[in-house]
Amino acid sequence: LMGKLTLSSEIERLKAIPDFQGTNWSSIKPEFAARMAIQNQFKTGIDVAKYTASIMRKDMEAYDSDTASYTQSLGCWHGFIGQQKLISIKKHFGTTDKKYLYLSGWMVAALRSEFGPLPDQSMHEKTSVASLVEELYTFLRQADARELAGLFRELDKAPQDQQQSIQDKIDNFETHIVPIIADIDAGFGNEEATYLMAKQMIEAGACCIQIENQVSDEKQCGHQDGKVTVPHSDFLAKINAVRYAFLELGVDDGVIVARTDSLGAGLTKQIAVTNEAGDIGDQYNSFLDVEEVTAETMNHGDVLINQNGKLVRPKRLPSNLYQFKKGTGEARCILDSITSLQNGADLIWIETERPHIGQIGAMMDE
């Protein structure tokens, strides 16, 4: 349902305004102003984000109690498409409950870039996602206004004995505003850039932001090969940046989805900083493809690390990227997921080369 605002209470509130007591506003009808207010209960994107965040948290709690109580998210790339989807859902199911919209980075790259259709490599404009979030909620608010306008017309035409039932429909109207899961890719830069972009997306109405652990300027579509990940400290800094954006804007229960692309990523941009054996940097580096070396077998320009008391040389490509050991993707996904959930993420996403429930289930069991 929408907010607690009811038509009758809003009419009474407006009538109490001093200017309605005299003749200055004699041509203004409180009833009409109240209807307009009911049609526009979400004044800003922050209002939308707060409202939808509470819905998403409630749905997450319901799913934790009963996995049959799941949500469904539909992808969309234009406000009109999103609007028509929600109108159809509400008409068919009688409710928009547990129905979300999903705003994918690849859709934005392919269909919303000023450069024209692009591959999913974060080459589109940084502001494209936030613009689409704002557009979607503009169209969804219009869907509310349209349906409520129909109810207002019914109320005007209805005989006295039928007006209360129509009034109840208005007061219990279910909005088309639903949560949007918005893809921020890898943050489009460092943590400062991530914070600024997340803030813009939240101001547009996003209550949920999905972020991935790829290198921002090397980012690939989740289904493509050649992906490059970053150490956990870099990724967690961006998760923190998104959380700070939520908190600054007053969306205290905003949702962060941490996506790991490690299953299809055989490369890392850098060796993680580690201060002691077993810390998160050391765990990340333990997956590197290395060979033990001595002073005699070292080459000019080699990068060497001390790993478990041994001097080793990580395999470095001509691109200056470092290679992980083969077959470590699932183990890295598990470490990524646990680390993200322990450090501020609310949900996790494990990117696979194709939908594979068994594969995901095995990693969750592990």
Question: What kind of feature is each model-predicted range?
Answer:
Residues 3-366:
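Alpha/beta enzyme core
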